[in-house]
Amino acid sequence: PFTAYLRAYCEAAWETETRTLRLDSTTLPLGRAETSSKEYLPFPALLGGVLTAAEAESGPFQVLLPSTQGAEADGQYPWGVETVLERQGLCRVKVIAPELETLPERCPEPDLLFRAFLVGDLLLCAPPEQRDALAPAGVPGWAELETLAAHIGAIPPEGRTLGIVGEPFTLFTLHDGVPDTLEQEGWRLLRAPLSEYLWFLWRDAGSSACREWAGRVEVLGHSRLGRSE
């Protein structure tokens, strides 16, 4: 549920058209053909998605691939993709790799960005069959987020509970439909909030914006926790 809202953020903040990278079984072989070792599955899938986009687009375009200041593998994906693009002579494709740790200080409208993550997390707390109906048309304001959190929090939980953790690409795309199948079978899936992870990341990086968001996030949490567990 994050994609639509993050695209809306990018289009509003940079006044540019956005498209979603294709990541599936057809793009994976393209990425694997360019790798020589046992990389984590998300990297060849992501690389294949970029190469597929390069085949479909004849003109120049940019690919947004966030990086990190740490040494973890997924924070280094942009540099690997850039190397392959250079080797194939695809200089018209530019990789934009902002550091996650400094996003609130360096990106335009950080409040809008944070709300884009929050609404995705809230929708994941709703029953899967109600998510489309509950999804706001655009990135909601704080008052709308509070209303949405209270509404979702009032929905009685049903089904057996299962917590799922993992790398984001695997959780939301490269999973062969397993989470969807589990939800159809009545399992209630719980995921760690992406917005919470980013809030702690930004707080530890010294972001001043996190102090402004703390109270608002607490209100959302109380609204959400109104739902009996």
Residue ranges and their predicted role:
Residues 1-229:
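An N-terminal assembly and electron-transfer interface module characteristic of large anaerobic redox
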